[in-house]
Amino acid sequence: MKISDLESFEPFLPQGAVVMISSKQHQLKALYRRFEHCQNCSLGTQRQNLVFGEGNPESKVIFIGEGPGEEEDLQGRPFVGRAGKLLDRMLAAIGLDRSDIYIANTVKCRPPNNRVPAPEELNACSPLLQEQISIIEPKFLFTLGKTATHSLLPLQDPISQMRGNWYDYPPIPEIKLLPSFHPAYLLRNPSAKKAAWHDLQLLAAELGNPQKKPSHL
C-alpha cells in the first residue's frame, strides 16, 4: 500500500506510519467521519481542528488525556506540545513509542484558554471516546490526570490517591484502568515524576515490557 493510500487515515495513524489497513482502522475512519463536523457542544464552534486521536489500533493500551491544547488544536494531533514531548520520554522509559500505543483525549476540541472541560462538554464527547475504546478493545487504559480518570470511573477521589491503583473500566470490566498524573502536571510539579515512574512500571509489568530507569522524565 502506498503512502498516498493512507492520507485519509492521518487523524488516527502515527505521523509517517505506513501499515496495512485493518478492520479496526476502517471502523475508526468511519467513526472519525461521523464526528469530524461535530458541534454537539460549544467547543465545536471554536476549534481549528478536531483532535480525534492517533496511534496503533491493535494496541493493548490507550493513553487518555484531558483535551487538546493550542498546538494540538493547530495540528489536529494529540500531545504535540511540551507535555507531548514529556509523554514521549515516559513511553521510551518503558520501551514504547507512539507506534505501539493509541492516544486519545476525553474531549476532542480545545477548551478556551486550556481550561478544564465543562461537564456538558465531557458528556458530549463521551460517546466518541467510548466507541474508540470499544473498537480498539485494549487490555489497559492509562489515564493521564484527574479529568480523564474521573470521566471514566464513578469515583471523584483526588488523583493523588487514585494513581498507582488498578480499577475495572465499568462498561467493560475486563479492561483494566490505571490512573496517573498528566504530563502537564508533571512539568509544573517535577517532584511528582517519581510517582509517575512507579505508575509506568506497573503498566510495563502488565505489558511484559522491559523497564529501564530513565536518567530523567
List PLM regions with ranges:
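A polyanion-binding, active-site-adjacent surface
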Residues: 1-217
